[in-house]
Amino acid sequence: MTTFYLSLIISLFFLIITLKVFFNTSRKFKNLPPGPQCLPIIGNLHQLKQPLHHTFHTLSQKYGQIFSLWFGSRLVVVVSSLTIAQECFTKNDIVLANRPHFLTGKYIGYNNTTVAQSPYGDHWRNLRRILSIEILSSHRLNSFLEIRRDEIMRLIQKLAQKSYNGFTEVELRPMFSEMTFNTIMRMVSGKRYYGNDCDVSDVEEARLFRGIIKEVVSLGGANNVGDFLGFLRWFDFDGLEKRLKKISKRTDAFLQGLIDEHRFGKRNSNTMIDHLLTQQQSQPEYYTDQIIKGLMVVMLLAGTDTSSVTIEWAMSNLLNHPEIMKKAKNELDTHIGHDRQVDEHDISKLPYLQSIVYETLRLHAAAPLLVPHLSSEDFSLGGYNIPQNTILMVNAWVIHRDPNLWSDPTCFKPERFEKEGEVNKLLSFGLGRRACPGENLSQRTEGLTLGLLIQCFEWKRIGEEKIDMVEAKGITAGKKTSLNAMCKVRHPLKINDVF
Ligand code: HEM
């Protein structure tokens, strides 16, 4: 009899717990944004075709400007409206200031402790402060100006040598990647890693490093199914975790080597490592080697590809629209003339050139879904309930093509930015406290590179055919095919440095 009552009490206890969980859960998931039917266990993962922002665009046409998906057991909400995106990063900015954790963050991002992956809180705030003051402040960016100028001039010289005797076909992508990569690498460590004229004494070291970065970029992204289906991780069926473990060891050893070189060898130069090692001397408990390596990784991964793909898209659009290229050239000829090269401080006086950069960022945002955010508590958005631990993605690609916001939204028309306030509708660098801290640096690099490319050369397409504008599948939305074009040095331009 006692056993009977005991079993009854235990059963009732479990029934109450189950009902409580059920009611809490269903209340929690009541009034969610609409979304497609999902399958047991995998949710909507089977529907996620690359590029993801295109799939989300199709889904938003059916389910609206805010919809829900299930990535395995994780709820994902996708926003495709500027007003709702602004609601995310004003009223709900703190609730959405966390990041979801992915396998790449665990292995490459020092267990999600870097500034790009770290949860919102004191640690993240400190890292943002270090990044803003020690590396990306206007003062520091000015002190790194010579590096940027030198790398861009190397690119200009290379093109000038190739095309001095007339129109010559050039492949631009590797040159843009070399330039942005060397710029960031020199800011970080003082070393040039790319190109025939790289100054790394150990060529093997340069080769190894290029391999590391290529692999890290290919493993990044928020669409590894193993991130959402925990049980797949136990089997590591695609070997992703094993590859990430291996690559993280190589990356760490490489970055540690760079720090040690500065610690035990050449100090007192203007590099990020040296500035951080100086801070380490006074505050060793905070400025650990791991913090420094995390900042190096973020600078290299967030700051290189993003800028080079933007420059490649801008040039592709200019080649498809010679009248825009001509207008930009006239602006440069009028304001700068033929006797000197355009410089970074001129860019603010060249509104049309700036508008070309904005228009490129509108149509070809390098991070079309920004970077995923995570809600730290339940909140409401666009009239729906969003539970804690929801992954939020903003489809900037769609918002930048919204016909209610932009006239002829798919046309490349820099003139649209002549209207005051238009630039405030851009989401290319995100909004709110987790917005991109590298915006100023990237706009300086893009403005100067494009300015010099337009000022110093004549450009045309290889044939009649327009440049193919199809997007690749990688984490940064680059062009699928590498950009080749015909270029010729502009003879009226008497610039000794270039020739
Ligand atoms: C065209 C160039 C670039 C574009 C389009 C771009 C875009 C973005 C976007 C959309 C985000 C996420 C914002 C969000 O979470 O809502 C981001 C974050 C970030 N970007 Fe950039 N970025 C560019 C260049 C750079 C550069 C040059 C650097 C640094 C050298 C940089 C460093 C970062 C960092 C550290 C974060 C993470 C911020 C955080 O989580 O607190 N980015 N970027």
Swiss-Prot record:
It holds the Pfam family p450. Disulfide bonds: none annotated. The keyword Metal-binding applies. Its cofactor is heme. Heme binds at C436. It is found in: Membrane. InterPro entries: Cyt_P450, Cyt_P450_CS, Cyt_P450_E_grp-I, Cyt_P450_sf, Plant_Cytochrome_P450_Monoox. It is a single-pass membrane protein. GO terms for cellular component: membrane. GO terms for molecular function: heme binding; iron ion binding; monooxygenase activity; oxidoreductase activity, acting on paired donors, with incorporation or reduction of molecular oxygen. Its EC number is 1.14.13.-. Keywords: Heme, Iron, Membrane, Metal-binding, Monooxygenase, NADP, Oxidoreductase, Transmembrane, Transmembrane helix. The chain crosses the membrane at residues 3-23. Probable monooxygenases exhibiting no activity with isoflavones such as formononetin, biochanin A, pseudobaptigenin, daidzein, genistein, isoformononetin and prunetin, or with flavonoids including naringenin, liquiritigenin, apigenin, luteolin, or kaempferol. Belongs to the cytochrome P450 family. This is Cytochrome P450 81E8. The gene is CYP81E8.
